[in-house]
Amino acid sequence: MPVLIESIGNLERRLTFSVPEDRLESHVDERLREIARAARINGFRAGKVPAKVIEQRFGEKVRAEVLDSLLRETLDSAIRAHSLRLAGAARIDHANEGGLNFVATFEVVPDFGEIDVSKLGVVRRTAKVTDVDIDQMIENLRLQRRTWRVAEHGAQVGYLVALETWSQAGDERLPIEGVEAGSTILGSGVMFEQIERGLEGLSKGDENVLDVTFPDDWRVMQLAGKAVQVHVKVIEVSEPVLLEVNEEFIKSFGVKSGKLEDFRADIRANLERELKGALVSHLRREIGEQLIAAYAHVEMPPRLVEKEARLMLAKQIEQIRLSGRDPTVIPDDAHIGFMDAACKRVLVGLLVGEIAGRNRLRLDPMRVTETLHLIASTYEEPEEVFQMYRNDPKLMEGVQSLVMEEQVIEWIADRAQKTEQVLSFQEAIQQ
């Protein structure tokens, strides 16, 4: 039967086609003959198994495999012949029970019209890692490994304070009885800023009453937006003890030589990797936002958007599960809340693909390899991780998609109207 294409929506198509029976049978016979030449079945010599036995043993499975292969091949050929550009995978159903006529339903890429990226405005941020940044990172590492000793003087920023508190908000006392025990490192923001400031200078056994006004969005509902008197009693004050940056300390971070210069070089490499990721991420986000603004009027394939929304919901459910909370309380239609964000993701993804296709941008294999090495370098066994990615098609597909998107984003940035902005390392990674 001839291929029949129907429009069943602005972006949805239905394609009716058939797999030639003689071609199917020819491929099945050829595959069964290949199996017969190598089959080892009890009671028969190798290569001498009767065709009827081979058919009984393998016929059904081989026919299904060959039909699936021919289905895809025939559909791909029809799609190419009619210059169709699919947005997502096609759903294939039998057109008649048990026959060889099929119906493929799919969505197509919308028409974006002219894509002129030269009208976009891009801020190209640049930054570099300095010795000061390395010094700061070493101090952060020392803080991570710090120990505590009881302080003989009042609390300062960076000190650990163990305390008991109770609060009075009008006629309401929290807790209703007794006190709440807790601790905070002054300056860390674990407790509300006004409380932490009120603890500075206090020593073990000191008590104080702090007048605090909590913001409207404060996490404790009974205190949100209220002026509260917080009663505090200091139980203990501890000061930090930082480790010396010596050979033992350096080796504990995987620097086998234990030398300071090697340690600093390792830190520089890590910071530069972090910086590059931050700059690329910011550029991707900025260009993505501009593409969304410029092409928000273009209708997106609804099934593709819904699929993306469900994927976003699935990720959130997994995060909820990993945090120990119960994900079953999420309603079945919760994906609807992700539809707007999903539509934007689909829009940017399709535009990236469209720009790559129109301008014949090709995936850079060297860049893929560099990205793999970059990913692997963050693990204890980088070579093992590198090979794991290389041998896993799904992992490789994810890396290749990431690299291709970065190539397109850079291609756009090179042709857009640019403004240069020089930032410090800290400014770059915090934006």
UniProtKB/Swiss-Prot annotation:
SUPFAM superfamilies recorded: FKBP-like, Triger factor/SurA peptide-binding domain-like, Trigger factor ribosome-binding domain
InterPro entries in UniProt: PPIase_dom_sf, Trig_fac, Trigger_fac_C, Trigger_fac_C_sf, Trigger_fac_ribosome-bd_bac, Trigger_fac_ribosome-bd_sf, Trigger_fact/SurA_dom_sf
Chemical reaction(s) catalysed: [protein]-peptidylproline (omega=180) = [protein]-peptidylproline (omega=0)
Keyword Hydrolase (UniProt): no
UniProt GO cellular component terms: cytoplasm
UniProt entry keywords in alphabetical sequence: Cell cycle, Cell division, Chaperone, Cytoplasm, Isomerase, Rotamase
Domain PPIase FKBP-type: 158-243
A single GO BP: cell division
Localisation: Cytoplasm
Molecular function in Gene Ontology: peptidyl-prolyl cis-trans isomerase activity; protein folding chaperone; ribosome binding
UniProt keyword Cytoplasm present: yes
Enzyme Commission identifier(s): 5.2.1.8
Function, in words: Involved in protein export. Acts as a chaperone by maintaining the newly synthesized protein in an open conformation. Functions as a peptidyl-prolyl cis-trans isomerase.
Family: Belongs to the FKBP-type PPIase family. Tig subfamily.
Comment text on domains: Consists of 3 domains; the N-terminus binds the ribosome, the middle domain has PPIase activity, while the C-terminus has intrinsic chaperone activity on its own.
Descriptive protein name: Trigger factor
